């Protein structure tokens, strides 16, 4: 968690939470070290000047977008409080006040995954991310079981998190293709492999971990390799970079899932503002990470209800951190 204090006594809050050291090229100790490296270059800057902030961060440290994300988030919080506007308005305008959230379905026996979906649907959830990426035949059966208990109002994303070898990904794709309404996400660990799979399947493809910047996004699009992107804000150095990616995706006709690697109330607030400023038709689904945590630093706000997320209306991120 990052707290930025200003001369005008406005404070801004940001957060980053890597999902361990192996999921992406990020980790908690790395975030702390990167922040220590960058902070001296930021001390005298205007936090409402996001361009200057990013120029200073980039001049003091190459890469480490995830650490820069926490500073960027705090600066947007300050910009909103200083201008009296919520971050969604500053990101382009509030286009929706609420949006559908997804639940990740843990990898397990197909019957257990099926029952998990049945239970979550009874709570109002209609967006599901199925964790697969193991034996392709068993994975296809897992997806089939879930499809059996869902309808056209549900969105099913079969997400391998890059877990398959290319051959296994092709086997899984062939078996899943006949199932209705399934989106395929990140079958393999490299962009080249994912593009190969998309070129040999009719399943709509969402790419996540292999899209690390605008360049890889444009490359994947030009290769006709995806129909959607999983937009994790810390991958793109915060809301500033995420807005660029979101707007480019919209221009290219790509849908987006909006979330982050992990986080609490602050990450959830930032995600809610980016989602609220995105056209409803462009959004696949959204994740409120604070639903997955036991601890809360801002009163468990914003909070989901019956599978729906909403965005705060107060200036900045719109949440109050309990200090």
What is the predicted role of each segment?
Residues 5-82:
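Metal- or metallocofactor-binding catalytic centers and their adjacent structured scaffolds
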Residues 1-6, 301-304:
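Short beta-strand elements
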Residues 180, 189-204, 211-308, 312:
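Shared catalytic-loop signature of beta/alpha-barrel
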Residues 2, 9, 38, 71, ...:
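Conserved, mostly hydrophobic/aromatic
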Residues 55-58, 81, 85-97, 309-312:
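N-terminal amphipathic alpha-helix/helix-capping segment at the start of soluble metabolic enzymes
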Residues 15, 129, 185, 206, ...:
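Conserved beta-strand positions in the central sheet of alpha/beta enzyme cores
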Residues 89-201:
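Metal-dependent enolase-superfamily TIM-barrel catalytic cores that perform enediolate-based chemistry
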Residues 19, 104-106, 131-135, 159-163, ...:
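Active-site beta-loop-alpha junctions enriched in small/polar residues
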């Amino acid at each position: 968690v990052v707290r930025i204090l200003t001369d005008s006594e406005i404070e801004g809050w940001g957060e980053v939470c890597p999902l361990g050291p192996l999921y992406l090229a990020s980790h908690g100790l790395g975030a702390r070290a990167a922040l220590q490296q960058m902070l001296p270059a930021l001390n005298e800057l205007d936090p409402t000047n996001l361009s200057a902030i990013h120029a200073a961060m980039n001049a003091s440290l190459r890469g480490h977008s995830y650490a820069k994300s926490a500073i960027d988030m705090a600066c947007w919080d300050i910009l909103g409080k200083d201008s009296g506007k919520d971050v969604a308005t500053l990101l382009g305008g509030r286009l929706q006040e609420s949006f559908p959230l997804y639940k990740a379905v843990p990898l397990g026996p197909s019957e257990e995954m099926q029952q998990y979906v049945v239970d979550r649907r009874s709570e109002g959830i209609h967006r599901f991310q199925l964790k697969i990426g193991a034996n392709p035949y068993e994975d296809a059966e897992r997806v089939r079981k879930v499809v059996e208990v869902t309808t056209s109002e549900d969105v099913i994303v079969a997400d391998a998190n890059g877990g398959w070898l290319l051959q296994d990904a092709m086997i899984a794709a062939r078996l899943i293709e006949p199932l209705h309404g399934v989106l395929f996400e990140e079958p393999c660990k490299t962009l080249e492999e994912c593009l190969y799979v998309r070129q040999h399947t009719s399943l709509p493809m969402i790419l996540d971990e292999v899209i690390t910047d605008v360049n890889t996004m444009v490359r994947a699009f030009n290769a006709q390799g995806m129909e959607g992107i999983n937009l994790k804000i810390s991958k793109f150095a915060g809301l500033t970079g995420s807005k660029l990616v979101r707007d480019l995706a919209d221009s290219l006709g790509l849908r987006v899932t909006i979330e982050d690697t992990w986080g609490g109330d602050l990450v959830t607030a930032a995600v809610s503002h980016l989602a609220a400023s995105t056209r409803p038709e462009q959004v696949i689904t959204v994740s409120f990470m604070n639903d997955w945590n036991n601890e809360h630093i801002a009163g468990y706000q914003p909070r989901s209800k019956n599978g729906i997320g909403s965005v705060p209306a107060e200036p900045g991120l719109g949440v109050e951190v309990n200090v």
